[in-house]
Amino acid sequence: WIWQQYDHTVMGDTIQKPGGDAGVVRVHGTNKAVAASVDSSAVYCWAHPHTGGKQIVCESFRNLIAVGAKPIAITNCLNFGSPENEENMGEFVECVQGIGEASEYLKFPVVSGNVSFYNQTKDKGIKPTPTIGGVGLIMDYNKMITMDFKQIDNVILVIGKTEGHLDQTLFARNILDEKNGPPPEINLFNEKNNGETLLKLIQNDLIKSAHDVSLGGIITAIAKMCIKGKKGINLNKPKYLINEMEYFFGEDQGRYIVEVSKKDLKKVTDILDKNAVHFDELGTCLLYTSPSPRDRSI
């Protein structure tokens, strides 16, 4: 509701409006476009500030990749309680170190930012809340990708390995009422490798739609893509040792949902294999129908 109140079509150059992974605006007189995304995750940073700092940079990186943009740089807004409190200051230091580590590895530099301390009521500070704004470049905006499912019978893949991490997830905190445990681990090699491989696939016109997997896990990402595209999906869980709850609601990092045409599927999977990128096949797009409780169609 909030972002809908703002004018996001100034001069008619907006070619992907808010509500997707990133907003995209054309650059006058060229085929280029700039993508921008803003992300924050107080829950992960509260559970483990260093991992949370890395995660929010990676989330920004993935959001830009998912629209077909090469990530260029980030700015930050770091919101914390009183630095006079040792715990608050420790959270700040760990979070900044995590941001720096991810930025350096992903070649996604911090070029500006600000710090806001003393965010508290009486002596109780807010959760550590770093906010990252990322920008990326699309060399040809005709290759921009959106998240909505496009075509019936196209194949849906998950790029990236699913381990079934449930601690600190939306599902665990809001459905299971479990608020302890660490956030998902960040593997920076996989983040970079998965993202750069997907970007190559997008640039070679092999991907029809894409969306990163974040809060709510695979099931939430799939639901958004179905709703946006007014499509359904014949959803199947790969034969993993983890159970369905862990597979569909886990918030393991470095993952994307992508839509691929059947004629391009072999090309895509060969490229993923060649680059050592794990993937699972989830199912195929359907005409939208009301789901039956006896099946796993969405």
What are these regions (language model features)?
Residues 1-66, 101-105, 117-125, 150:
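N-terminal glycine-rich phosphate/pyrophosphate-binding loops that anchor nucleotide-derived ligands
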Residues 45-112, 128, 132, 197, ...:
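Extended, hydrophobic alpha-helical segments in both membrane/secreted and soluble proteins
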Residues 288-295:
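Conserved small/polar residues in nucleotide/adenosyl-binding loops
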Residues 81-162, 242-286:
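Phosphate/diphosphate-binding loops
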Residues 186-253:
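Active-site-proximal betaalpha loop/short-helix elements
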Residues 33-35, 68, 149-179:
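Short, acidic (Asp/Glu-rich) active-site segment that either coordinates a divalent metal cofactor
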Residues 1-4, 67-74, 106-114, 168, ...:
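Flexible, glycine/charged-enriched surface loops at secondary-structure junctions
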Residues 3-9, 74-79, 111-124, 213-221, ...:
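A glycine-rich phosphate-binding loop feature that marks nucleotide/adenosyl-phosphate handling sites
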